[in-house]
């Protein structure tokens, strides 16, 4: 008789970034909407308490020091003055608070960007002060908005690549070559502007336009903030043929993003070229609450890379 040797199977170890993680939030909010003739004032006050806890993280290796509670009071004050329906300047000043979510606190393991992330259960919440100045208006044929803003964020939450002994301590020797951990930057500043318009050029024809830009600064390192979107301009057209059919087309232009973080990423953030995309679509409204839509995105199948889309690191198979 013959006896065969049983096959050898690979043994896989389950990966559990964290277990029994919870983020509990309680907020109390009051608001008053006041009218003084053409002046409308909106004031709000809010207090939040946020508590995070987990039984373990990093595949059960860490079981202590995982609880954190935070609280903050935030407020906003806005005013709109209606000179006419088409001319309504406004100003808004606000103070905001954001605590880390479950993933930012506890997830310990590989992510889609190719890095192994170490959990940060004691990460501090963000607080931000923002001022916004704008203009808006609308009537039967025209609707528009335009604004500029500036926001200063303390304890900004972001992921940073670690090297050397810091990477070994956070991610272990096996994952030290591609290790990141969420941390707080002391101060960052966002300065931006955006605008939007919708205009009925003729019967059943509407033209649309929107534009946005933002400049982020890492005030700790005096360089551009990591992963800021490129300037974007979008132009669109809608044509309602009758009560059932509508055709639309969009042209999106994205500017080259050359403002990249070099010191923070150790040269890991690259500039991305600009691009232009064309989308077209048709919608058939065959019932009051039902419709069928056919659309072609990126006509011509143009190759492009959005700056906020993270590519592979080169360590994947």
Identify the residue ranges that each predicted region occupies:
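C-terminal beta-signal and adjacent terminal beta-strands/loops
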Residues: 97-98, 152-154, 159, 253-261, ...
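Membrane-embedded beta-barrel scaffold of Gram-negative outer-membrane proteins
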Residues: 82, 88-94, 122-185, 189-191, ...
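Transmembrane beta-strands of outer-membrane beta-barrel pores
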Residues: 2, 36-38, 47-53, 93-99, ...
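Signature of Gram-negative outer-membrane beta-barrel scaffolds
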Residues: 1-88, 99, 110
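Repeated loop/turn-to-beta-strand initiation elements of outer-membrane beta-barrel proteins
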Residues: 38-41, 86-89, 141-144, 203-207, ...
């Amino acid at each position: 008789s013959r006896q065969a040797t049983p096959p050898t199977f690979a043994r896989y170890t389950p990966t559990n970034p964290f277990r029994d993680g919870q983020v509990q939030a309680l907020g109390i909010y009051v608001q008053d909407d006041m009218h003084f003739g053409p002046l409308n004032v909106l004031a709000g006050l809010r207090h939040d308490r946020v508590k995070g806890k987990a039984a373990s993280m990093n595949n059960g290796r860490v079981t202590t020091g995982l609880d954190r509670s935070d609280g903050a009071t935030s407020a906003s004050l806005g005013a709109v003055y209606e000179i006419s329906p088409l001319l309504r300047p406004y100003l808004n000043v606000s103070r905001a608070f954001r605590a880390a979510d479950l993933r930012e606190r506890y997830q310990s393991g590989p992510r889609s960007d190719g890095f192994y992330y170490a959990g940060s259960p004691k990460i501090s919440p963000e607080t931000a002060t923002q001022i916004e100045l704008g203009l808006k208006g609308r009537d039967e044929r025209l609707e528009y908005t335009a604004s500029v803003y500036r926001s200063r964020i303390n304890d900004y939450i972001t992921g940073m690549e670690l090297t050397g002994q810091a990477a070994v301590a956070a991610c272990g020797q096996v994952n030290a070559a591609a290790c990141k951990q969420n941390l707080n930057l002391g101060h960052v500043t966002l300065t931006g502007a955006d605008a939007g318009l919708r205009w009925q050029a003729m019967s059943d024809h509407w033209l649309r336009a929107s534009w946005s830009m933002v400049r982020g600064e890492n005030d700790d390192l005096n360089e551009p903030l990591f992963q800021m979107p490129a300037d974007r301009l979008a132009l669109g057209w809608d044509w309602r043929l009758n009560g059932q059919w509508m055709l639309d087309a969009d042209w999106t232009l994205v500017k080259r993003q050359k403002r990249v973080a070099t010191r923070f990423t150790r040269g890991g953030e690259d500039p991305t070229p600009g691009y232009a995309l064309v989308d077209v679509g048709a919608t058939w409204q065959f019932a009051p609450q039902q419709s069928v839509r056919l659309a072609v995105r990126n006509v011509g199948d143009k190759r492009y890379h959005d700056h906020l889309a993270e590519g592979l690191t080169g360590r994947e198979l």
